[in-house]
Amino acid sequence: TCTVHEQLNDDTFTAGTHTGDVKSNIRVENTGTYPAYVRVRLVGRWVNGAGETVGGVPSRLPAVKLLGGWLAGSGDTYYYTTAMAPGDMTGVLCEPMVLETGTGLDGSTSYQVVEVFAEAIQAAPEEAVSAAWGVTVTDGVITAVQ
């Protein structure tokens, strides 16, 4: 198991949906009892002032500038390249993301939300990681995403 840790406008969150201007310091903690690899998927959407999803507005993500230790996969999925011991936390995923404010189809203000979904898989055996996630693991490091 794993938990996402992130900041939004310098406030720290570990779960839930939050709106704001800048999302930063996205990290994942291995909360399981075995060494594990982790990956995250970013999902963008728009909400109104009450936090309700706004329909009819195409979702998109801000530009993601990865930091060290992460590899980009398909479908806005990112892989931490090394297995983590229980209790360890990944390095920060990316540079801070600036979230947009827009206008809904009805003219109301809408706010961009980026949700971070994390997934962990037991690190041993490496072949299981490769088969389940379609990655290449070399000497304990994810070196390629297929």
Model-predicted regions and their roles:
Residues 1-146:
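Long, small/polar-residue-biased beta-strand-and-loop interaction regions
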